[in-house]
Structure formats: C-alpha cells, structure tokens
C-alpha cells in the first residue's frame, strides 16, 4: 500500500530513473552470474526498489531504540535516547581565513550493513554533470556530496519521525482498540521471529501484532500495548528529493526544491559557488494537545484524536547567517 501511495506522488522523471536503474542491475546480474551471491532476487522490479528505498528510510528512524527502551527494566529512569543529527558543519566565509564558505560532511557510516558507506564519482556525458559523494544500498542518488556547483549534507530530525501511544485493547480473540468514541476493530497479523535456545540454537517463534483500519501498527511489549505512528510511511520518498538536489546549480534552486517537495525529517545544509550558505529545517510534526506532549516519550490514549488533524508545518530556513 505504501508503494502505491508513493508512486502516485513520485514524478515521471524519477520513476524512469528507477526503471533505468533496474534495467542496468538486471543486465549486469545476468551477464555476471558468477559474481551474484543470491540469484533469486533477480530480476529486480521498480516496485521492489521503491519499497526498499522507503524501507531504508523507515529503518533509519531507528525504531529499535524506543522498542528496546520499552522492553528494558521497568525501573529505568531515563527517557528515550536523545537523537540529534551530526552529519554536517558549515562555516560562513565571514569566519574563514580564505574568505570562502566551507562545508564539512561527516556521514560516520559503517562499512557494512544496511547503512554502509558507498563513495562514488560520476560523470554524465549527456548533461555534463559531475557528482561526487556517497550513496546508500539500493539507492542510486547522492545522499550527501557535491556536483561542484553546490555541496550539501543532510541529517535526520529524529524527534518528529514517530510517536508512541499507550493504548488499551479489548477482547480475547478479536481485539478492538478502546477509545472514547467506542471500540475500533483491529486487523491481526502474524510473522516468524527467531530466538536462541540456550544461547546457541536458533528456534522459530510466532509473533503477532495488530493494525488499525488506517494501517497504524499496535504491538505488545511487556504486557502493555503501544500504537506507533510513523507519518513518513507512504508520504514522501527522500531518495527522489536527493535525486533532484544533486542536479541543482545554486542554493536558491535547492531552497525552491525543499519548499516545493516538503520532505519531512531531514535538516539540510548547503553552500554554492557564490559562498552562500543555506540551512533548512524541513520537518512536519503531528499537532499535539499540549506543549508538554511535544517532549513526552509516550503519549496518552486521548492524544490519538490528534492523529487525523493534519500536520503543523515546522519548516523554516536561514540564508547566509551573520553569526
């Protein structure tokens, strides 16, 4: 469902780029079968690539951290881990010896795993565009880097990425969500997970979760039920914005793209060849019932009424700061 929603919003240009990407890796896999570790994943379809790119964004939210916190000792005094991005540092030409604006990108990516660092240097013969930077697995767009007209970096705006609600369910077999207006029927889903017997032998176990009619998951942790709302799902695809930014020629163009696209959850810093600096806090937060709820780790059931009331546009930008 998320892929269908995304495809309705993705530009034809980006959909074509995804198709070309699939054609290229499928042809390579066919002609280099001896280098393919798992031939079963080929041929790769455009839908699967979009799904994987979006899943990479969802995994990047780091939902494992609040999940681990909720599963941890009950006497734990600390709240959810503080999550602040630290990928970019830019200095205005007003404060550098050379008089030029400087940007430092520190992606601190691991060399293995789903967020491993892949450094690439590309040159498009047709357009004459040259790109240098890094990409993440299953993507083909520069996440941070330069096209030698602009240089940019992004970092996650974590607090706005998800909300956790403590909820109550009724029923034994047919679970229903208990809200002020009444009982809402839920969908039940099951999946296999694995545990280690005696710390050595993997053994499959069946886990279950529930979803609301609009698709929000409800999980049981330590005998309590939590609803997890992730507004990003099916809303925007960050890799498309990266694709468009990588061809920008100035900060003004990047600002226009971010304003037009409205991609949530990423703070962006860029400089251009005229030594301009741009900072964009491009975030959307669910509207809360009170100011205190913006700082709460777990929200009450009453706050569920806020989910369908839209988003507060928290986007702002700063150009060429004086200090």
Region spans (language model):
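Glycine-rich loop/turn
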Residues: 74-101, 113, 208-249, 256-266
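Short secondary-structure boundary/capping segments
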Residues: 55-60, 117-122, 158-161, 166-172, ...
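Generic, well-ordered alpha-helical scaffold segments in large soluble proteins
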Residues: 21-24, 28-31, 73, 94, ...
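Hydrophobic alpha-helical segments
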Residues: 263-323
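Compact, glycine/acidic-enriched structural inserts
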Residues: 126-203, 242-247, 256
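Short helix/loop capping segments that flank catalytic or ligand/cofactor-binding pockets
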Residues: 99-100, 111-115, 120, 131-133, ...
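Substrate-recognition/specificity elements adjacent to catalytic centers across diverse enzyme folds
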Residues: 1-114, 119-141, 230-231
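Structural recognition of the beta-strand scaffold that forms the well-ordered cores
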Residues: 90, 102-104, 142-145, 150-154, ...
């Amino acid at each position: 469902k998320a892929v269908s929603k995304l495809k309705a919003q993705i530009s034809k240009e980006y959909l074509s780029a995804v198709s070309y990407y699939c054609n290229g890796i499928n042809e390579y896999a066919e002609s280099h079968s001896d280098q393919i570790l798992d031939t079963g994943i080929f041929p790769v379809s455009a839908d699967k690539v979009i799904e994987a790119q979006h899943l990479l964004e969802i995994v990047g939210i780091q939902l494992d951290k609040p999940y681990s916190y909720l599963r941890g000792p009950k006497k734990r005094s600390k709240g959810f881990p503080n999550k602040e991005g630290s990928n970019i540092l830019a200095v205005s030409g007003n404060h550098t010896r050379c008089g030029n604006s400087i940007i430092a990108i520190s992606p601190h990516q691991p060399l293995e795993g789903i967020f491993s660092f892949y450094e690439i240097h590309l040159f498009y013969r047709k357009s004459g565009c040259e790109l240098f930077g890094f990409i993440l697995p299953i993507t083909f767009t520069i996440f941070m880097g330069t096209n030698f007209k602009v240089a940019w970096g992004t970092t996650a705006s974590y607090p706005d990425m998800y909300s956790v609600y403590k909820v109550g369910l009724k029923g034994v077999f047919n679970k229903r969500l208990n809200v002020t207006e009444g009982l809402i029927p839920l969908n039940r889903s099951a999946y296999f997970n694995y545990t280690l017997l005696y710390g050595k032998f993997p053994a499959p176990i069946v886990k279950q979760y529930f979803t609301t009619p609009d698709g929000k998951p409800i999980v049981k942790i330590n005998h309590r039920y939590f609803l997890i709302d992730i507004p990003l799902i099916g809303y925007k695809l960050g890799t498309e914005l990266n694709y468009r930014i990588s061809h920008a020629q100035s900060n003004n163009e990047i600002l226009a793209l971010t304003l037009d696209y409205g991609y949530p959850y990423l703070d962006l810093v860029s400089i251009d060849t005229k030594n301009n600096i741009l900072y964009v806090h491009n975030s959307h937060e669910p509207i809360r019932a009170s100011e205190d709820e913006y700082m709460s780790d777990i929200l009450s059931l009453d706050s569920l009424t806020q989910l369908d009331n839209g988003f507060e546009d928290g986007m702002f930008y700063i150009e060429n700061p004086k200090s």
